[in-house]
Each structure stands twice: as structure tokens, then as C-alpha cells.
Amino acid sequence: MKKSLILLAALAGALSAQALDVNNLKANDNGKFWSGRAAEGYGISIGTEPKVLYNTLKVSSADGALVIDTREFFKRPDARKIVTRFYIKNNIAALKGKETSAKVQIQAEEGSGAVNLYLEGNRGTEKKHYFTAQPFAVSGCSEIVHTKQLPEDVNDIAIRLDLNKPAVYRIFNAAISAK
């Protein structure tokens, strides 16, 4: 048990962001997405499918969380999903060929949330590669984790979180760790 707790603590701290103190949060009217930076130094982008509905999102930062209100977006008949990416600076060499976990602390309010969690990145000469997704139902505060063996030729990696139902989502933490 003690060994498991030590290993869990080491994994939680490895290559991770400890809080989501978001700044420079702004809408990009040309690219039709939201962007921001976490105090920990990684980038955040929030887009919609279709892109033209990005301005229906209410995006803010409050109490150590990124807050995304998707209720107006999902009232539109052509609304499909919100794609949120966390471009976490990490030592990619430490992840190559390793079992890697994406971990997100999230809460859904004013609705029952549904999300897909991905490890997303580039490998070899491919532009985008999705290292599988895992669906989660979210209510209250949850910690969701998706683990995948990364290939040896991975070039970069990000956490992708698709928001699939109307709710007010609060994202408290996003982290990547490897065994």
C-alpha cells in the first residue's frame, strides 16, 4: 500500500500542472476560437464544431478554474462539440514509448456533463494523431484519467477534452504523466 501511494504521488507530480490559473483569456475572431495561457506556462485553446458558433460560449477564469458555459452553444441545432486543448510543456523524450496518462479535474454544473478525453499529438511526419479517446459522464467534481502507450516516434502531445453536453464546466487541473 505504501509503495502504491508513493508511486501515485510521483505520477501526479510528474510533467503536470498543479492548478489552472488562466490568464490572457481572449476570443480570436479571425480563427474563431478562444485562447489563453495558464500561469504554469502552457497554452489553452477552446474551439467549437462548427467554428461559427464559438461566440456562443461563455469562457472565463474563476477561483482557480477555467470555466466554460456551453448551454447557449448546445441550444443551436447544428452544435456538435467544444474542443478544448491543453498544450502542456513537457519533456517529450520522457514520454516516448511510455504508458502515458492524461488527467483532468473537472466539474459539471447546471446540467450533466459528458466529455471525451484524448491524448493528442504528432508522430513521425503525421500532422495529428489521436491516441484514442475515452468517454466520461461528469457530474459534481471528478478526476478523469485516460492512459495510453505512446509510440516511440511521438513528436509532441496535448490533452484534448471534448465537451459534448450542455453544462457549466469548471476545469481545475490538466496534467500528463508517464510510467
Show where each model-derived region lies.
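Hydrophobic h-region of N-terminal signal peptides that target proteins for export
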Residues: A9-A17
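Positively charged n-region of N-terminal signal peptides that target proteins for export
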Residues: M1-S4
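Extracellular and organelle-lumenal recognition/adhesion modules and their flexible linkers in secreted
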Residues: A19-K179
